[in-house]
């Protein structure tokens, strides 16, 4: 298990990012055969499988991909838009929307920062929990629970 070496305040974004990265790296060390996670559903509250939820393999690959961004930074904006949107139409519409918002003078940067910052904090904590759940479930499946 990877141990955190940096000391930041408990709710600092850097602490949350470090915790997430450490948990995903731990998950990668524990899960030796990721294909075992295919078609295995994550248990929800009460031990019941969540309907329409992705399987553990999907979570595993998503958590690893996000961790690469957390560890190494984001792709350049153009590459990211091409990868996610698949076309330039979405990127053009988004650029026009930002320009309209800036021109109208309604851009409250501080409020937007706090909204995105708190959302990022919440999402990273949720993803950290998912990495722990994938690791725990894999250990249960392979008899490695201790």
Swiss-Prot record:
Biological-process GO terms, alphabetical: lipid metabolic process; regulation of lipid biosynthetic process; regulation of triglyceride biosynthetic process; response to bacterium
**Main location per the UniProt record:** nucleus
Query: Where is this chain compositionally biased, Acidic residues type?
Result: 94-104
Q: Which Gene3D superfamilies match?
A: 6.10.140.1610
Cited InterPro entries: Lipogen_MT_Stabilize_sf, Spot_14
Record region (Disordered): 83-104
Q: Which GO terms describe its molecular function?
A: identical protein binding; molecular function inhibitor activity; protein homodimerization activity
Q: Does the keyword Lipid metabolism apply?
A: yes
The organism's place on the tree of life at top rank: Eukaryota
Q: Keyword set for this entry?
A: Cytoplasm, Lipid biosynthesis, Lipid metabolism, Nucleus, Transcription, Transcription regulation
Cellular compartments annotated: Nucleus; Cytoplasm
Say yes or no: keyword Transferase present. no
GO terms for cellular component: cytosol; nucleoplasm
Q: In which tissues is it expressed?
A: Mainly expressed in tissues that synthesize triglycerides.
- Protein family (similarity comment): Belongs to the SPOT14 family.
Q: Assembly and partners?
A: Homodimer. Heterodimer with MID1IP1. Interacts with THRB and PLAGL1.
| Function as written in the Swiss-Prot or TrEMBL entry | Plays a role in the regulation of lipogenesis, especially in lactating mammary gland. Important for the biosynthesis of triglycerides with medium-length fatty acid chains. May modulate lipogenesis by interacting with MID1IP1 and preventing its interaction with ACACA. May function as transcriptional coactivator. May modulate the transcription factor activity of THRB.
Q: What is this protein called?
A: Thyroid hormone-inducible hepatic protein
Organism of origin: Homo sapiens (Human)
Taxonomic classification: Eukaryota, Metazoa, Chordata, Craniata, Vertebrata
